């Protein structure tokens, strides 16, 4: 795989070494087609900080990107229906603190002492042929104290993204289920005819709005 082709693969794809040439070609075709979806993407809502989750609620899809010129970056456009779950995680970075002894040498405390910083990560689990999850750091800079204002804000953003994607996914699935449900004949309150409401919930005879 040449460097130029490697750059075109999804940033969320991590199975390159275990993929066949044909699988790589399929993904490159998908990434090329994705450019059209990016071009037509209309942001209706923005969540997150430096790494943003952009929602196109009209087209029922979303993008995760940290690029300010995200259209040029060709981020993967995912459908709300592809989301299978979301979960957040707090990761700790422990850096040992040392002291200087009487001889001027650095040594550990007994017991050892650590400076602990925190990062909040969100993982969006997705149903895609090319990757299973999208993981990114929610906070823009490392958090020094747990339960600080910065920590709570990162947790709030993670929860907001999770709740938004989960809710939108359920709405899409409910709409699909409703569309597949068998239609039931009803009596039109306007003309009295027995009718099967059309896709807009209107009587097929008089056009009256009778709902679905």
Task: Kindly give the residue locations of the regions a language model identified.
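Short cysteine-rich clusters marking metal-coordination/redox-active sites
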Residues: 2-5, 188-191, 203-206
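Alpha-helical interface/anchor segments and their boundary "cap" residues
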Residues: 17-37
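Short, flexible, mixed-charge glycine/proline-rich loop motifs
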Residues: 174-185, 192-198, 210-211
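Short Cys/His-rich "knuckle" micro-motifs
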Residues: 1, 12-16, 90, 197-202
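Conserved beta-hairpin
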Residues: 39-82
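Netrin-like (NTR/C345C) domain of secreted extracellular proteins
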Residues: 4, 13-21, 170-181
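Short Cys/His-rich micro-motifs in 6-15 aa windows
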Residues: 4-16, 206-212
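Acidic, Ser/Thr- and proline-rich intrinsically disordered linker/docking segments
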Residues: 84-183
């Amino acid at each position: 795989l040449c460097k130029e082709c490697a750059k075109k693969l999804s940033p969320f794809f991590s199975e390159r070494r275990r993929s066949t040439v044909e699988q790589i070609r399929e993904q490159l075709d998908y990434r090329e087609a994705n450019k059209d979806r990016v071009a037509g993407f209309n942001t209706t809502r923005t969540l997150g900080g430096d790494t943003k989750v952009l929602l196109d609620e009209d087209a029922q899809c979303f993008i995760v990107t940290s690029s300010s010129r995200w259209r040029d970056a060709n981020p993967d456009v995912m459908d709300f229906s592809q989301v299978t779950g979301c979960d957040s995680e707090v990761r700790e970075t422990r850096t040992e603190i040392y002291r200087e002894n009487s001889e001027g040498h650095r040594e550990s405390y007994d017991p050892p002492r650590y400076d602990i910083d925190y990062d909040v990560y969100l993982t969006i689990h997705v149903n895609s042929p090319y990757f299973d999850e999208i993981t990114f750091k929610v906070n823009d800079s490392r958090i020094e104290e747990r339960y600080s204002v910065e920590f709570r804000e990162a947790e709030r953003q993670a929860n907001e993204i999770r709740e938004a994607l989960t809710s939108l996914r359920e709405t899409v699935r409910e709409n699909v289920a409703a569309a597949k449900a068998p239609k039931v004949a009803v009596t039109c309150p306007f003309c009295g005819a027995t009718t099967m409401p059309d896709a807009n919930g209107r009587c097929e005879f008089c056009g009256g709005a009778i709902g679905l």
